[in-house]
Amino acid sequence: MTTRYIFVTGGVVSSLGKGIAAASLAAILEARGLNVTMMKLDPYINVDPGTMSPTQHGEVFVTEDGAETDLDLGHYERFIRTKMNRRNNFTTGRIYEEVLRKERRGDYLGATIQIIPHITNAIKEKVLAGGEGHDVAIVEIGGTVGDIESLPFLESIRQLSVELGRERSLFMHLTLVPFLGAAGEVKTKPTQHSVKELRSIGIAPDVLVCRGDRPVPANEKAKISLFCNVEERAVISLKDVDSIYKIPALLKAQGLDELVVKRFGITCPEADLHEWEQVIYQEANPTGEVTIGMVGKYIELPDAYKSVNEALKHAGLFNRVSVNIKYIDSQTVEAKGEEVLQGLDGILVPGGFGERGVEGKILAAKYARENNLPYFGICLGLQVALIEFARHVAGLEGAHSTEFNKETPHPVVGLITEWINEEGNVEQRHETSDLGGTMRLGAQLCHLSEGSKAAISYDGNTCVERHRHRYEVNNNYKDRLEKAGLVFSGLSSDRQLVEMIELPNHPWFVAGQFHPEFTSTPRDGQPLFVGFVAAATAYQKRDLG
């Protein structure tokens, strides 16, 4: 199969939405029957984002094969059917690590290791490998043109475009076309300078996607075309929208997909966007609204919970309600108590690491349990629910996780002592193990108890969800907790690890050790999120009634 490559760069400012624009183009091409994949090349030195602060970098998206990746891969999976893997995201740090490892082994036969050709060759090899087996591979380059960090990646894709030829490569550049209120017009100079910077390193964009808060007028498109040496039909206006799921239709209306397939000489049918039209219709026509309190510790940056936010919105589509997310700092719950949890239709406690704010999450679980308020716990959200139940129902005073209190008299949650590395080898984990890449990661099979809310939600007796954690329920306490009324409704494939818990006499008190948000999409939803929002809707109606 001959793979065509679309390289996506950004200029003027960061946070223009390269990932969303690239994913939207991928969605249109997929709707034309093409097999599309995507890649994100990140210029930072970290080997992967696994140990980066969520409040700086946003969430870590976990793929089926257990790679800890950039949150843009979450956008990719929400827009196209192709599942991402560890080949779809790599960093400068990963490239340098692999090149230096080869140098230490003597693979370069004593050569002087340089950015060109050794680093650029390594980048090109990964890009080509990631695109194998697909009709089109869309490659997003992180950062902004002009950044020092991005230069090796830009040089690599410049070389690739020469090697692949025009029939197999295309450059799409996102820029900002700001509107100046004082002048009463949009300004194209930032775009012109950004393209000039890109051309100075040997890359001439074939498509310009112009971001702004309003459409770019036709006369300004003509001006951009003239000064940036890009066909006028390839100057695409992409204004701000109230829903990112409208973007595929906006790009298609301007003929971007047709331009791409003609450039690549691909014969394929017109794009069928009826699934996206349905998503947009459901989003625009809710029959009600529910308020979900998300009790977390990274709420100053909502992108730290990007997939959770999106999964709640998707669940709203399937329940025909809009979901209003109220972000609640778990430390505020510790300081002010239950008053900050009033007026909610459901509580969701997402994942997290470290002791800060844990008691606030435990209090949130207690409030939901005692007030029959729908509760959904994810990863740490399961652990705090279990700790709360152990303390206040099972009579295990002082129960805790050894992550937060190594001297707890009742360690109901403890460290997983074995883990499998990327090569598939079993290694021992202990308190001083490296933080990076030493968790239980990726898709795992879970057996569900018959008749449980979990089994009803999934409409079956198994599910496969993605994990990212070091700590698990301590099996030594299972019998005592079960006798107190807790149901262990999900177990690992070998039935040795607890994957899900729930309370049978509660409208919806369900928690999973995994991260179901990573498998939610606007077209398909996710069973547990759909069930949770349905329970929140029912709670609201009962409360109002």
UniProtKB/Swiss-Prot annotation:
The active site is at residues 379, 515, 517. UTP binds at residues 14, 187-192, 223. Keywords: ATP-binding, Glutamine amidotransferase, Ligase, Magnesium, Metal-binding, Nucleotide-binding, Pyrimidine biosynthesis. Residues 291-542 form the Glutamine amidotransferase type-1 domain. GO terms for biological process: 'de novo' CTP biosynthetic process; pyrimidine nucleobase biosynthetic process. It is an enzyme of class 6 (ligase). The keyword tRNA-binding does not apply. L-glutamine binds at residues 352, 380-383, 403, 470. It catalyses: UTP + L-glutamine + ATP + H2O = CTP + L-glutamate + ADP + phosphate + 2 H(+); L-glutamine + H2O = L-glutamate + NH4(+); UTP + NH4(+) + ATP = CTP + ADP + phosphate + 2 H(+). SUPFAM superfamilies: Class I glutamine amidotransferase-like, P-loop containing nucleoside triphosphate hydrolases. Allosterically activated by GTP, when glutamine is the substrate; GTP has no effect on the reaction when ammonia is the substrate. The allosteric effector GTP functions by stabilizing the protein conformation that binds the tetrahedral intermediate(s) formed during glutamine hydrolysis. Inhibited by the product CTP, via allosteric rather than competitive inhibition. Catalyzes the ATP-dependent amination of UTP to CTP with either L-glutamine or ammonia as the source of nitrogen. Regulates intracellular CTP levels through interactions with the four ribonucleotide triphosphates. Homotetramer. This is CTP synthase. The gene is pyrG.
